UniProtKB/Swiss-Prot annotation:
Function text: Hydrolyzes allophanate to NH(3) and CO(2). Can also use malonamate, but with much lower efficiency.
Effect the entry attributes to changing S189A: Loss of activity
Activity regulation (UniProt): Inhibited, in a time-dependent manner, by phenyl phosphorodiamidate, which forms a covalently modified Ser-189.
pH dependence: Optimum pH is 9.5.
Record's catalysed reaction(s): urea-1-carboxylate + H2O + 3 H(+) = 2 NH4(+) + 2 CO2
GO terms under biological process: atrazine catabolic process
A Pfam family matched in the record: AH_C
Family the entry assigns: Belongs to the amidase family.
EC id: 3.5.1.54
Species lineage: Bacteria, Pseudomonadati, Pseudomonadota, Gammaproteobacteria, Pseudomonadales
Gene of this entry: atzF
Organism: Pseudomonas sp. (strain ADP)
Active site: K91 (charge relay system), S165 (charge relay system), S189 (acyl-ester intermediate)
GO MF annotation terms: allophanate hydrolase activity
The protein's name in its UniProt record: Allophanate hydrolase
Length: 605
């Protein structure tokens, strides 16, 4: 489930149930919310979830609070901590001091004494790594099922895969537990789960983030990645995480420009694979949503340039069918030789296939890749950015387990070449199928164009919302966007609470499919309650208001049960804070979902 209803015992104060992105955490802390209470409540909520395969291990609460206290002391001394009090998840192939690093394999587990380089940079900025997240074993997979720790599932429909290999990291963000997580992305392991859970997945240029403290999958290609709800959050985290590491031979020096946002010209060229080279494996709705994304980018001033996808596809095939699979064996060779029984059967077969490779195969692969990179140059001479589906389709867990190699390979159709060709990429939401499953696209740029493509991805996600009110194409700085659905709508009884707090109406839009709306019993004034229901048909009308950060915490703290603030997904795939209802309150409420909104229901009375 993507959206959490507020906990009944915690309504009335700002808790993790109200906090979904960096802005909401920062607004709450600025308004006086105690960060220790937020972290403690977060642990309580994880405990309530019970046996959830998101997490492999958790940092003890006492350790998290001690880390927070240290950050508070540094903050009180005037140190700038841009991520103060922000909890995050860490994929369990990245070291967190004191927690076992398993890489999804109990027989591999070891406990490091120090954080990975990137984790340490985030901790230095005040963030709190609360635990290690589930993954496809040794980051070998794009589906999330290759793990002995239970299978994380798509938050929109638990019958479907979450995507991988950064499965737990994606689900931890998508279900609202943490505002961001670290994943990794060698073949698409950060982008695929982002698409399947309606998130942003930022895959930086190789070497922009240090790999020190990362269990290698393919060391020459590995990238630590960021999963978040918004492009702004992904960039904010990336700017902290990025940095040259002299102890990592694959770390690269890059100027601040690599993560600097770019104002795109009114006219630009974007490349898409020629129609005959596109593949959706029978998923007609994914194909339609990609075509819609192309039209949207044209509305934004882009000129669509079709290109020959052949060299990119052939490069992608080298990742597992070529000598680069030997890098996976190099990372765990002694374990694979001495204790092959501890490996997941599918992962074992993939990694041990490297034993068939020779040194000659390796050099032939290097030569072949160089030829393909040269062949791709003619495409890059014509385009400013590439637009691809993040994944051609999505599969059920049952289907993936029945055909794990072929279906997993299908998922990487548009992702596997990116690191081999030294490119940057960011995956963003791009709408929903009629069954409520999300679809995503990826913007791909040259090396160190991370900030530029992120800017375009952000504009893409916000485009539909901007059309709702052309005068406000993006939220003003120092505001938090909040979706209202009932008594806070324009001309409704509680709208004054927004206007008196300095709120400004930005747009009228609709939620993504899969929300139910109920008229609450004995509510004064009359108001509805909305919650996520994957069986609900249609969408719900909402207004988006921009509320000053200074007033956000106070506004939230006055919301009475059974309502609270959680994450709401809009019809364009973007996320905002918005009103959600505790599930128990609908037991005596009237289902008014079929009206499509509160105003339509009132008009019918």
């Amino acid at each position: 489930m993507n959206d959490r209803a507020p906990h009944p015992e915690r309504s009335g104060r700002v808790t993790p149930d109200h906090l979904t992105d960096l802005a909401s955490y920062q607004a709450a802390y600025a308004a006086g919310t105690d960060a220790a209470d937020v972290i403690s409540d977060l642990y309580a909520r994880i405990k309530e979830d019970g046996e959830n395969p998101i997490w492999i291990s958790l940092l003890p609460l006492e350790s998290a609070l001690a880390m927070l206290a240290d950050a508070q002391q540094r903050k009180d001394k005037g140190e700038a901590l841009p991520l103060f009090g922000i909890p995050f998840g860490v994929k369990d192939n990245i070291d967190v001091a004191g927690l076992p690093t398993t890489a999804g394999c109990t027989g591999f587990a070891r406990t490091p004494r120090q954080h990975a380089f990137v984790v340490q940079r985030l901790v230095d900025a005040g963030a709190i790594p609360i635990g290690k997240t589930n993954l496809d074993q040794f980051a070998t997979g794009l589906n999330g099922t290759r793990t002995p720790f239970g299978i994380p599932r798509c938050v929109f429909n638990e019958n479907y895969v979450s995507g991988g290999s950064s499965s737990g990291s994606a689900v931890a963000v998508a279900n609202g537990t943490v505002p961001f997580s670290l994943g990794t992305d060698t073949a698409g392991s950060g982008r695929i789960p982002a698409a399947f859970n309606n998130l942003v997945g930022l895959k930086p240029t190789k070497g922009l983030f240090s790999g020190s403290g990362l269990v290698p999958a393919a060391r020459s290609l590995d990238c630590i990645s960021v999963l978040a709800h918004t492009v702004d959050d992904a960039l904010a985290v990336a700017r902290v995480a990025a940095g040259y590491d002299a102890d990592d031979a694959f770390s690269r020096k890059a100027g601040a420009a690599a993560l600097t946002e770019k104002s795109w010209p009114r006219r630009f060229n974007f490349g898409v694979p020629a129609a005959e080279h596109r593949q959706f494996f029978g998923d007609a709705e994914a194909e339609a949503l990609f075509n819609k994304a192309v039209r949207k980018l044209e509305e934004m001033g882009g000129t669509c340039i079709s290109f020959d996808y052949t060299p990119f596809r052939q490069a992608a095939e080298l990742l597992y069918a070529g000598p680069w699979v030997a890098e996976r064996l190099a990372a765990i060779e002694s374990l694979a030789d001495e204790h092959p029984e501890v490996l997941h059967p599918v992962v074992r077969d993939i990694i041990l296939s490297a034993k068939r490779m020779s040194a000659v195969d390796t050099f032939n692969g290097i030569y072949r890749l160089a030829d393909l990179v040269r062949a791709a140059e003619s495409t890059w001479e014509k385009i400013d950015v590439m637009l691809l589906p993040t994944a051609p389709t999505i599969y059920t867990v049952e289907d993936m387990l029945a055909d794990p190699v072929r279906l997993n390979s299908n998922l990487g159709f548009y992702t596997n070449f990116v690191n081999l060709m030294d490119l940057s990429a960011i995956a963003v939401p791009a709408g929903f199928r009629t069954n409520g499953l999300p679809f995503g696209v990826t913007f791909i740029g040259r090396a160190f164009e991370d900030g530029a493509i992120a800017s375009l991805g952000k504009a893409f996600v916000e485009h539909d919302l901007a059309k709702g009110n052309a005068a406000t194409a993006a939220p003003p700085k120092d505001t938090v966007a909040i979706a209202v659905v009932g008594a806070h709508l324009s001309d409704q009884p509680l709208n004054h609470q927004l206007t008196e707090s300095g709120g400004k109406l930005r747009a009228t839009t609709r939620t993504a499919p899969g929300y139910a709306l109920y008229a609450l019993r004995d509510a004064t004034p009359a108001k509805p309650g909305m919650l996520r229901d994957q069986n609900a048909v249609g969408s719900i009308e909402v207004e988006i208001w921009d509320l000053p950060v200074a007033g956000f915490g106070a506004f939230v703290s006055e919301i009475p049960a059974p309502l609270g603030i959680g994450t709401i997904t809009l019809e364009d795939g973007s996320h905002v804070k918005g009103f959600l209802c505790e599930p128990h309150a609908i037991e005596t409420a009237l289902d008014i979902t079929h009206y499509g909104g509160w105003r339509a229901y009132l008009a019918a009375q």
